[in-house]
Amino acid sequence: MNGLPSTEAPGGAGCALAGLPPLPRGLSGLLNASGGSWRELERVYSQRSRIHDELSRAARAPDGPRHAAGSANLGSAAGPRRPVNLDSALAALRKEMVGLRQLDMSLLCQLWGLYESIQDYKHLCQDLSLCQDLSSSLHSDSSYPPDAGLSDDDEPPDASLPPDPPPLTVPQTHNARDQWLQDAFQISL
């Protein structure tokens, strides 16, 4: 109804987008009723306020129509147990929202950690590639002059050149997240 693809959740809990958990029970009816427009949302809010006022008046007058019908019929006529008033419904919604906020923050932290790990891994691969390119260019045969017909008695040609640099290694990080990536992809560095 709001223009988004939705599927009905089991048990009629409301609409859920593909790949996302279903909406909290307290919001699903509001979203379906609003149709996505703010004017409709205002209308629903005023209707909810009117219902809250009626519930408050009914709670203050125990001899109202609900009480006259008898307590035996009250449970069967109401169907599934629902919150008695708007305050308890809001408290239940608040609890659900806190849980969703905690889940959201947890997922956000995990995504951020994964993003950082991917960036670290990219930099590590780039550094390794750069080191390998540099090492191969230093040790390639074309970078050294060929033997100029020297005899065994002459000084070796490497004596005039500086000694070979130590082999280049990628610095090892001490981050558990990087270790997890190396273990997960079985990369030997």
Curated annotation (Swiss-Prot):
One of its GO terms (molecular function) is transcription corepressor binding. Residues 55-81, 141-174 are annotated as: Disordered. GO terms for cellular component: cytoplasm; lamellipodium. InterPro entries: LURA1/LRA25 (IPR039499). Pfam families: LURAP. It is found in: Cytoplasm; Cell projection, Lamellipodium. Keywords: Cell projection, Cytoplasm, Leucine-rich repeat, Phosphoprotein, Receptor, Repeat. Residues 68-79 have a biased composition (Low complexity). Signal peptide: none annotated. LRR repeats lie at residues 86-114. One of its GO terms (biological process) is negative regulation of SMAD protein signal transduction. Residues 159-169 have a biased composition (Pro residues). The modification Phosphoserine is found at residues 28, 188. Interacts with SKI. Interacts (via LRR repeat) with CDC42BPA (via AGC-kinase C-terminal domain) and CDC42BPB (via AGC-kinase C-terminal domain). Interacts (via LRR repeat) with LIMK1 (via LIM zinc-binding domains). Forms a tripartite complex with CDC42BPA, CDC42BPB and LIMK1. Negatively regulates TGF-beta-induced signaling; in cooperation with SKI prevents the translocation of SMAD2 from the nucleus to the cytoplasm in response to TGF-beta. Acts as an adapter that mediates the specific recognition of LIMK1 by CDC42BPA and CDC42BPB in the lamellipodia. LRAP25-mediated CDC42BPA/CDC42BPB targeting to LIMK1 and the lamellipodium results in LIMK1 activation and the subsequent phosphorylation of CFL1 which is important for lamellipodial F-actin regulation. Belongs to the FAM89 family. This is Leucine repeat adapter protein 25. The gene is Fam89b.
